[in-house]
């Protein structure tokens, strides 16, 4: 693929930082190497000398001596080599990307670690979006994505979707305004990429089926656009077998996938990872070299030590326990909704994730209801307008999260909300 046509002028101008290059060399060098290159602080002057973390099974992860010194020091912008290696092997096991053994300049799969997947996504957007570019999304979508894209001056087009995700026929209709060969002409402004959250979409909880993904991928090939597969809730799918990913069917090297440990291990550690064609991942890393420099070394090593202790089987066992918890939480909020909101509102059963997307009947704009009146009744929800491209347009929707509240709290919240809706009709 010709990746240069997707890159912005800023991204094309990026060059490796010589300082960061020496850090990469140092991370792989033998201990006999005498380093006078980097400006790394002397760890003997760091005030922290040890740390210990107790894991849920009662075991302990300890940071002492050389490990604590490493955890508090600069590290490579790509990510810690051992964690990169573990994650690459895990991605191959989970998704078996066709591009694993491609030549580096022809879409070979690569991976880098970011400060949460939002960090990686923002860098991907800035790598790809020029003012006036056409970008495809499916509403409603996470405001963090919208607010990262909008300042870049792109033309954001909504692709119709339902409870099973993006509707391929709707995408075909949008694409029909161009000819496939138009992608070779920058003045035609053909779509540069499709952004989607395929599992447990925030806020709807909808998931894209495998069959639809195949149709969408073929359209991406026909019209030559990239796919950004933002999948933070991949490990929170409530039914097995899990649907195949876009990465698993990427024969061209046109998929950039964003993963995170935020939903399953810790949101505060801020560790995510981006997988995709080497040319594009390298550009994200070049951005990291001169911005955040690298993801937190301590956070990366905490996760690495945990993964080494667990192994793949232990990690997936933790995922199963996590899924059971959130599935029970989902069932609790559905029970509360059915008890109090039946007849007043409607919703689909979330397939994954942490959210229930609710449409109130008879109220065309829930903004005041949710932002003011519900808070007065001590119920905090998110109004739906912020999840749409035109955030000023009225909407009957709002988002309820089932991640933190107890079943009793969910029941009480929806009881209060039901009374409020009745008063507002």
Curated annotation (Swiss-Prot):
Keywords annotated in UniProt: Acetylation, Aminotransferase, Mitochondrion, Phosphoprotein, Pyridoxal phosphate, Transferase, Transit peptide
UniProt-listed GO biological process terms: 2-oxoglutarate metabolic process; biosynthetic process; glutamate metabolic process; kynurenine metabolic process; L-lysine catabolic process to acetyl-CoA via saccharopine
GO cellular component, one term: mitochondrion
One protein family per Pfam: Aminotran_1_2
UniProt cofactor(s): pyridoxal 5'-phosphate
An example Gene Ontology molecular-function term: kynurenine-oxoglutarate transaminase activity
SUPFAM superfamilies, sorted: PLP-dependent transferases
Transit peptide: 1-29
Known tissue expression: Expressed mainly in kidney and to a lesser amount in liver and brain.
This enzyme's EC code(s): 2.6.1.39, 2.6.1.4, 2.6.1.63, 2.6.1.7
Main location: mitochondrion
Reactions it catalyzes: L-kynurenine + 2-oxoglutarate = kynurenate + L-glutamate + H2O; L-2-aminoadipate + 2-oxoglutarate = 2-oxoadipate + L-glutamate; glycine + 2-oxoglutarate = glyoxylate + L-glutamate; L-kynurenine + glyoxylate = kynurenate + glycine + H2O
Claim: ATP-binding is one of the keywords in the record: no
Oxidoreductase recorded as keyword: no
Modified residues (N6-(pyridoxal phosphate)lysine): 263
Modified residue annotations for N6-acetyllysine: 69, 179, 263, 339, 351, 367, 422
Transmembrane segments: none
Top class in the EC scheme: transferase
Protein location: Mitochondrion
Modified residues (Phosphoserine): 40
Record pathway: Amino-acid degradation; L-lysine degradation via saccharopine pathway; glutaryl-CoA from L-lysine: step 4/6
Entry's family note: Belongs to the class-I pyridoxal-phosphate-dependent aminotransferase family.
UniProt-recorded name of the protein: Kynurenine/alpha-aminoadipate aminotransferase, mitochondrial
Natural source organism: Mus musculus (Mouse)
Gene field: Aadat
